[in-house]
């Protein structure tokens, strides 16, 4: 299953940086040097993982991930600070979310300690690919999937946990705010489905409306709930918030919305700032009456929503440096990149060497 190569010890290259034009970084795949692979046979615990040269994985055509879509992924970042430290942001929360998703998809999973260790190893092995401060981040993508062959029967004989990394720039390049299309035909998630976990099956089914929205000039899509078609849920890959007066609202999780790590942090910061924070069902009519709106996620961090368009009617929201979104972005980014003291205990330092 794993690439046919001997495991390599985690070591730091003499090169401080890879040969990359950091100013041109986008949010897309860039091949780096190493990846992590661990396997688990049915009825056993996950083996100790290995750092291997980045390579294609060998996969049985009857693997559960190919036959039935049994797979999950996570996403988190490594940050290089001005004083040369390497930081992760709440990796334990991603490990816990992976476990919740694995339970939902009937899969074994690594412990949180093994998950965090894997992320640290991948970051260190690819340290030269971590952009200079202010130029981007190292995006780390852990994946858990059914790698053993299965055809109409349980249990799966083998599960694989792997992680790779890519240097990335900002997910949304336009700092002026997103222009969203409210999708009124396709639905992202359904009650009692998998919308509350990062199942690999959640994403490509909505590529059609997303591609159409992009062709029409929109930044992204805001989805409505499947049950009524009247309440907002989330973007393609981000949670959504609204501000009305002193009240910050975000849709309640309820199994159809991903419990974002950034979402959780933003709610806590809003309370620190003196706002009333509520998780509730948000009718579209309420959302359209908001003073301000923004989305949150590992990729997007905190990004203002400039407008939403529903059935050709466009509604605008406040954007700019004086918005709550801007304050949240600055505060969260300062913590993540070590520019301010982390009084929350959210960051994990993994390397003290410059």
From Swiss-Prot:
Catalyzed chemical reaction(s): a 2-oxocarboxylate + L-methionine = 4-methylsulfanyl-2-oxobutanoate + an L-alpha-amino acid
Lineage: Eukaryota, Viridiplantae, Streptophyta, Embryophyta, Tracheophyta
Tissue specificity comment: Mostly expressed in phloem.
MF terms in GO: branched-chain-amino-acid transaminase activity; methionine-oxo-acid transaminase activity
Modified residues (N6-(pyridoxal phosphate)lysine): 198
Protein name in UniProt: Methionine aminotransferase BCAT4
GO cellular component: cytosol
EC number: 2.6.1.88
Family per similarity comment: Belongs to the class-IV pyridoxal-phosphate-dependent aminotransferase family.
NCBIfam families: ilvE_II (TIGR01123), PRK13357.1 (NF009897)
Record key words, sorted: Aminotransferase, Cytoplasm, Pyridoxal phosphate, Transferase
Enzyme class: transferase
Stored CDD domains: BCAT_beta_family
One Pfam family matching this protein: Aminotran_4
Essential cofactor(s): pyridoxal 5'-phosphate
Extra facts: Although all the other members of the family possess a branched-chain amino acid aminotransferase activity, the exact function of BCAT4 remains unclear at present.
Compartments, as annotated in UniProt: Cytoplasm
Induction: Transient induction by wounding. Follows a diurnal rhythm.
Phenotype reported upon loss of the gene: Reduced methionine-derived aliphatic glucosinolate accumulation, but increased levels of free methionine and S-methylmethionine.
GO biological process, one term: branched-chain amino acid metabolic process
Subcellular location, principal: cytoplasm
Chain's role: Converts 2-oxo acids to branched-chain amino acids. Shows activity with L-Leu, L-Ile and L-Val as amino donors and alpha-keto-glutarate as an amino acceptor, but no activity for D-isomers of Leu, Ile, Val, Asp, Glu or Ala. Acts on methionine and its derivatives and the corresponding 2-oxo acids. Catalyzes the initial deamination of methionine to 4-methylthio-2-oxobutyrate as well as the transamination of other typical intermediates of the methionine chain elongation pathway.
